[in-house]
Amino acid sequence: MVAVAAKKRLTPIPEHCFPVTFRFQWYERNRRRDKDNVSAFGRKVVLDGLVQAGIMPNDNWNYVEGFRDEFYVDRDCPRVRIEVYTYAE
């Protein structure tokens, strides 16, 4: 599902911009899940989807510099917002 959405909305990251850093903003319905459970599984799904969609060639150390996670509660609209910071920025 992530790969399908990524293909529709994103363009591939140019090779010269790697490695990239991801900023994840997690909006949960409530505070029931531990933050590490939200981010660890969520990051895996998102990054694998970006690779599968062809947005980035791989999610290994050569392509991913790191992560920044932020957590919020939004009872009406749980979601994740992702920003990608490239090496060139």
Language model feature labels by segment:
Residues 1-89:
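Catalytic phosphate/metal-binding cores of nucleic-acid and nucleotide-processing enzymes, i.e., regions
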